[in-house]
Amino acid sequence: MITTKDIKKIYEWSKVTTFPLKKAPVIKGGYCNKIVYISWLKGVGKQVTIRKKLMTDEIYNIFSNEDILYATYSKFLEGTIIYPHRDPPVYRERYKRIQVPLSIPDKNTCFMLWDGKKVTWKEGIHQVYPVMDVIHEGYNLSTKAMEFVMIDVKMDTIVEDET
């Protein structure tokens, strides 16, 4: 289970953390019009890797939850468009994504189309989506960067206050 309290702690920690950024891997054919910057926080492959140097013990313990498959800080520059897509099966298990918005410059110009319906974010309020199953696209049409922590969890994980 991932609690709202856990997500709030991740949000508060993320707001005061400076993340070392790198360019997200480019997917063949491209999935967006601009470079997205990321800082990985947790990865699961042959072994579990957590970027403990960036974290307090409390945050490390939250990310140690085996229901969390992957986590990253993501920065979408102004004018970024993420084209319509479903996320691929990149883990051994099906997953859903917890989006934790850190900085949303403008809810009118920063949004997601989820199955054709407009969804907006509020900073610090998480939303959960089965990104493998539904076509979605994202927009930052504002003049400032939009920032999130994205947390991929096993599909059957209970996420408190799941949308």
Which functions belong to the PLM regions below?
Residues 31, 83-85, 134, 138:
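Intrinsically disordered, low-complexity peptide-like regions
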Residues 40, 52, 78, 113-115, ...:
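Surface-exposed beta-strand edges and flanking loops
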Residues 57-130:
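Catalytic core of non-heme Fe(II) oxygenases with the double-stranded beta-helix
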Residues 109-163:
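Catalytic core of Fe(II)/2-oxoglutarate
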